[in-house]
Amino acid sequence: MTKKRTVKRKVKEPEPTKEQPSVSEQSENEEDEDLLQAVKDPGEDTTDDEGIDQEYQSDSSEDLEFESDEEGNYLGRKVSNEAEEGEDDQDEDDDEDEDEGEDEDDDSDDDSEESDANEASATPKDDQPSSSKAAAAQTKEPIIQIIPRDPSKPEYEESDTSDEEDIRNTVGNIPMHWYDEYKHIGYDWDAKKIIKPPKGDQIDDFLRKIEDPNFWRTVKDPMTGQEVLLTDEDIALIKRVNSSRIPNPEHDEYAPWIEWFTSEVEKMPIKNVPDHKRSFLPSVSEKKKVSRMVHALKMGWMKTTEEVEREKQQKRGPKFYMLWETDTGREHMRRIHDPVSAPKRDLPGHAESYNPPPEYLFDEKETKEWLKLKDEPHKRKLHFMPQKYKSLRAVPAYSRYLRERFLRCLDLYLCPRAKRVKLNIDAEYLIPKLPSPRDLQPFPTVESLVYRGHTDLVRSVSVEPKGEYLVSGSDDKTVKIWEIATGRCIRTIETNDVVRCVAWCPNAKLSIIAVATGSRLLLINPKVGDKLLIKKTDDLLAESPNLDIIESERIKTAVQWSNAEPDEQEKGVRVVITHFKPIRQVTWHGRGDYLATVMPEGANRSALIHQLSKRRSQIPFSKSKGLIQCVLFHPVKPCFFVATQHNIRIYDLVKQELIKKLLTNSKWISGMSIHPKGDNLLVSTYDKKMLWFDLDLSTKPYQTMRLHRNAVRSVAFHLRYPLFASGSDDQAVIVSHGMVYNDLLQNPLIVPLKKLQTHEKRDEFGVLDVTWHPVQPWVFSTGADCTIRLYT
């Protein structure tokens, strides 16, 4: 059963004018159209109650009637030409319905016909603006007056909904800049795009700023892109927050204090029970106990404290001290008669002040060094980092207080105290007397040439036996041959992979370069120098010897010999030795017929020895005793040096047995070099150390040198002069004097001479390789800055 409720509005037709409608009138027309559309389509969700009470414009004076059911849902409207006749007819119809009790079906049919007629006649015209005022008719049926919502109150304050805000854009809590590239800003409840409002230029903003009095209180809603006008309450709230006051003006900051719990301590008994009668009588049990004690005293069973102490002294007997006693006894007596007081703590210095002078504060370099010694705090100069505060009030609590108190207690409790005679020793007496560097010349002191041409890290460098040419390998997959005297690049050979190591054959009668690129070892004829020597080298590498020896499958799967392809033959490549794993290092024997390669990932086949004249290879080890880093041939004896991560093993190739194992006590070995006489070995490590081993003296280092600040990557001995050099990631090449005497009773003389630091650091890498000129006291270094530098 539906009831008809009417809201009637009288509309007067305005006088026609030739002026264009203003912006406010156009907005009213748009609102009227929305209102009429909402009334016309009752199926749509219309939640804006405000629009019903707004004035709308029409071209005729008509009355609107809204129909609603018992729940208040609007079903339609109807329009009559004359307001009074429509009201009377409506009243009569309602009276007849109530008195006669007609069927509900007839009423619903009449209502539907009237609503259809109203829909057909209530279409407004857009081209004629008009204004109207709403007036409710005095009829018998109840008329519902639509009260506009107070904008100062929340939208759902008086309703039973749980929503707290009017959400127009349903995209959720996401960054709105995601919609910067689109024409819409989100989607409404009907899944329709919300088109962005048109944006004006700076002139429009300037005109609005001048003409619009509410421009200063207009903000933009980021969710819908619409402009929102702040109310007076919002402005007042912003002002209170900006002035650091409580946002709610009704809140009283200084309300009278209500003392819910009293501050006065009231002492009251837990139980207020009157004392029992027996509490005033003497205790019977105590009386019996006292009587037993009196009986024990009379019988002599119980003794007083003085009698007990006298009996203890009689049992202990007299004390006698021995004249000749052990040291422990004397120390015990000394602690009794001549105690040593605990040492006092050191007084705080200027660095421990809360406002120390600037020279006591750490700079960036000192701070990094202090933090690096986290695992070794005993090496720090100060156990704390000096801090500066503006005032004593800003000084926080000392975090190490409890630990220092605990350590102090341990020192007092556990550390023995003794008086020792201090020895006055001159410090200069302990320093070994070293010769002056001027007396140890010649050695390189300045940078003479820079060889530029590579575009990536230069990994390795090697010099021709005569000292005229230089070969280098880089990560840019090229091998370059240089003329040392002029710095000119003579030839560039491109490879298919990164060049890890290059080595020039030490035999002056051959012109061969061994290049380790990827898993291939290339034997290249550089075609520089004597033409007869070049031809002899080509003839040697072109001949393929007859292999009468049958190789095992273990060797065949590890390495294969082959001649170079025609395109590689043009570059100078003659022989290709293909390995099953990437090659890291290649080294030659002193005679130039044997060369060894290292593959760290090869397990028990990491080290291979190749013979050039017979074109065959052999695997010297059947078991892997560590990750092999580098290998080396002895210059005189048939010995083979193998360096793993932590140790160095020396093998006799003739007897095929282990001769000696050198203990480095380091974390990771990076390289090694042997003295030309073969009795001393120099080892570089990644933990900033250089180790000098005397092979005739011991298996432990004769001297450990910590000359670099970062990892030491390469070391090299000079073939003629008593010099050796080291290169590190700290961009420095340190040249040192290392004299080895023929007298076995005299120790080697080691003197650091010069620090050459001209390389640039890139990606935490500095100097990657160093090598000496075979004749002159010149040293070459390669670095991560894609250059090769010559120091003379």
UniProtKB/Swiss-Prot annotation:
Places the protein is found: Nucleus, Nucleolus; Nucleus, Nucleoplasm
Region feature (Disordered): 1-167
Bilayer-spanning residue ranges: none
This protein's UniProt keywords: Nucleus, Repeat, Ribosome biogenesis, rRNA processing, WD repeat
Molecular function as annotated in GO: ribonucleoprotein complex binding
PROSITE patterns assigned to the protein according to its UniProt record, in alphabetical order: WD_REPEATS_1, WD_REPEATS_2, WD_REPEATS_REGION
Origin superkingdom: Eukaryota
Gene Ontology process terms (BP): maturation of 5.8S rRNA from tricistronic rRNA transcript (SSU-rRNA, 5.8S rRNA, LSU-rRNA); maturation of LSU-rRNA from tricistronic rRNA transcript (SSU-rRNA, 5.8S rRNA, LSU-rRNA); regulation of hemocyte proliferation
Ranges of Acidic residues composition bias in the record: 44-53, 60-72, 82-117, 157-166
Protein purpose: Required for maturation of ribosomal RNAs and formation of the large ribosomal subunit.
HAMAP family in the cross-refs: BOP1
Family in the record: Belongs to the WD repeat BOP1/ERB1 family.
Protein name (database record): Ribosome biogenesis protein BOP1 homolog
Species per Swiss-Prot/TrEMBL record: Drosophila mojavensis
